[in-house]
Amino acid sequence: MTDANDTPATPPRESLIEYPSDFPIKVMGKMQDDFAETIVQLVQQFDPEFHTGRMEMRPSSGGNYLGLTVIVRATSREQLDALYRALTAHPMVKVVL
């Protein structure tokens, strides 16, 4: 398949990420005592070696929200897709980037 410029189209499942690799994911939610712990437990289901040393926390300026950056060891696109689905489906999570 080619596009209008006669260059090959990128296959839809082709990834720009080389696996395995460290991959940052930003997760935001309401400021709650167990938010970070809950996210750590969820991420560990997909990356068993994940620990709090691979996470940064930033409260919002108003103190109502907490932003987390988790660095996961990505082993496949399927793993990342499943992790994103689990994070976005969690009731404590407002945004995943």
UniProtKB/Swiss-Prot annotation:
InterPro entries: UPF0250_YbeD-like, YbeD-like_sf
Family that this chain belongs to: Belongs to the UPF0250 family.
Name by which UniProt lists this protein: UPF0250 protein RSc0326
